[in-house]
C-alpha cells in the first residue's frame, strides 16, 4: 500500500455534505505512515464534475472524474475493500501541489 494507489473504500456512514458510499479513493498519505499506522489518508474520486479550485481532473478506469481534495480524510485500513489501480507520478505530484496550496498560510 503506497501513495498513489487507488482502493475501493467504504465511506459510510457520513454526515452532511461529506462524500458518501463505496467508491474509489487515492491514498495520499506518505508511505512511511502507510507502513506503520492502521490508518491512511485518502482523497475520494467522484464522477460529478465541479469547478472547485481544489479538485483535480482525472481519468480512472476509462471514466472521467475528479479527485476531491476538498474531501480528504483519514480512514482505518479496514475501510479499504480492494486495490483497483494507481495513479502515475505526475498525477500524484499534481495532487501534492494542490494539497500544499490548501495547507499553506
State the predicted function of each range.
Residues 1-105:
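Conserved functional hotspots at enzyme active or ligand-binding sites that engage polyanionic ligands
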